[in-house]
C-alpha cells in the first residue's frame, strides 16, 4: 500500500510538472514518468499452464549423481518449495505432500526409469510435474574465485494416462547478476540459496497468474 502511495505521489508530481511545461517537452516528461513508474512497479503475468486446476499432482526432481553429491539438499528443497507453491496457487484438488513424496522416492530409487503412467498410479495422482536438472553450479569449472552460478533444467508435465508430456519448458536462471563477486563478498550458501529461490520462482510461476517487476533480474 505504501509503495503504491509513493508511486502515486511521484506520478502526481510529475503530472503537475508536465502541465506547466512547454508543449514540446510534455512528451519527454510523460515518457520519463512512465519509465519511472515501470522501474518501481510490477505487472501481472498470466499462467502458461493451468492444467493442474481440479487435478492431483506430484513434483519429481531428478539430477545426476555429481549434482546430488555436491548439493545433497538441492532436490529435496526444490521438491518441497515447488510442491507447496503449486498446491497453494493452482487450484489443484490433491497432491503428494513433500515429506511423504521424498520418503517414497528414497524407498523406490528406480523411480527415474519407471514409466510415467505407472509412477502416477503408484503415487495416486492425475499429473506429474517432472524437473530434470541438467546443471547446478556456483562457478565455472576451474574458477573458484569468482561466482558464476547457474541453475538449469527441463520442466515437463505428464498426465497419468500417457508418457508424452502435455507441457514442456526450459528453466534457466543465474546469479550473481554482475561480475566480480567472489567468496569475500558472498558465501557459497548465499549463492546456492538465491539460485534455488530463482529456480523455484521460474518453475512455479508457469502454473499461475503472478506479479513480476517490469524489468526482472531473472
Show the residue positions of the predicted features.
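Bacterial N-terminal signal peptides that target proteins for export
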Residues: 1-11
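C-terminal motif of bacterial Sec signal peptides marking the signal peptidase cleavage site
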Residues: 20-23
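C-terminal/domain-edge helix-coil "capping" segments
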Residues: 25-54, 119-123, 147-150, 156-218
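Short structured motifs
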Residues: 44, 114-116, 137-140
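N-terminal segment of the mature soluble domain
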Residues: 53-134, 160-168, 194-211
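Extracytoplasmic/secreted cell-surface and envelope-processing proteins
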Residues: 69, 138-143
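"Short basic amphipathic alpha-helical interaction patches in structured regions
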Residues: 74, 144-148
Amino acid at each position: 500500500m505504501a509503495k503504491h502511495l509513493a508511486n502515486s505521489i511521484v506520478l502526481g508530481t510529475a503530472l503537475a510538472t508536465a502541465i506547466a511545461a512547454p508543449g514540446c517537452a510534455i512528451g519527454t516528461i510523460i515518457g520519463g514518468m512512465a519509465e519511472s513508474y515501470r522501474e518501481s512497479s510490477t505487472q501481472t503475468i498470466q499462467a502458461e499452464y493451468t492444467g493442474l486446476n481440479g487435478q492431483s499432482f506430484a513434483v519429481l526432481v531428478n539430477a545426476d549423481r555429481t549434482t546430488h553429491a555436491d548439493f545433497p539438499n538441492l532436490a529435496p528443497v526444490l521438491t518441497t518449495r515447488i510442491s507447496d507453491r503449486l498446491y497453494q496457487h493452482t487450484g489443484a484438488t490433491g497432491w503428494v505432500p513433500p515429506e511423504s513424496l521424498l520418503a517414497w522416492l528414497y524407498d523406490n530409487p528406480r523411480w527415474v526409469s519407471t514409466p510415467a503412467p505407472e509412477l502416477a498410479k503408484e503415487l495416486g495422482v492425475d499429473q506429474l510435474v517432472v524437473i530434470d536438472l541438467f546443471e547446478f553450479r556456483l562457478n565455472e569449472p576451474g574458477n573458484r574465485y569468482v561466482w558464476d552460478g547457474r541453475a538449469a533444467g527441463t520442466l515437463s508435465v505428464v498426465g497419468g494416462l500417457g508418457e508424452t508430456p502435455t507441457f514442456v519448458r526450459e528453466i534457466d536462471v543465474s546469479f550473481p547478476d554482475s561480475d566480480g563477486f567472489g567468496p569475500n563478498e558472498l558465501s557459497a550458501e548465499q549463492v546456492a540459496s538465491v539460485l534455488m529461490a530463482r529456480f523455484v520462482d521460474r518453475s512455479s510461476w508457469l502454473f499461475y497468474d503472478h506479479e513480476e517487476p517490469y524489468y526482472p533480474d531473472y
